[in-house]
């Protein structure tokens, strides 16, 4: 451990930051399909932020309700976000499988960014 690590460990972390990190961890490992490579990272970051903030994008009411239920239960549900015309006129999907199932085991939960 270097000196900076020791200093950082001594700084108390605000509870809201701990809560945010715990929330983000419930989305598991974030991965993308190879087709997403041309999409600028700024766009991907914005879409991921929307997804983890429960802005599901361009979904029908039924899919929104399913997302809201899975998000509320945190019991391994699926979350889908669809963002029309997100890049080059194309829709981008972000799908979280196993949301909140076991935040300490990222193999059980992951979020994938892809074109439909």
Regions found by a protein language model. Give the residues of each.
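Short intrinsically disordered terminal tails
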Residues: 1-4, 115-116
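Compact soluble domain cores
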Residues: 5-81
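Short, compact, well-ordered microdomains
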Residues: 72-116
């Amino acid at each position: 451990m270097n000196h900076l690590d020791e200093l950082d460990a001594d700084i108390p972390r605000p509870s809201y930051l701990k809560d945010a990190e715990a929330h983000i961890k419930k989305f598991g490992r974030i991965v993308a399909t190879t087709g997403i490579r041309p999409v600028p990272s700024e766009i991907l970051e914005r879409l991921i932020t929307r997804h983890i903030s429960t802005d599901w994008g361009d979904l029908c009411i039924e899919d929104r309700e399913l997302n809201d239920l899975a998000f509320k239960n945190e019991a391994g549900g699926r979350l889908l976000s669809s963002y029309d015309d997100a890049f080059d006129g194309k829709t981008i999907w972000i799908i979280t499988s196993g949301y909140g199932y076991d935040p300490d085991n990222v193999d059980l939960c992951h979020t994938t960014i892809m074109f439909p």
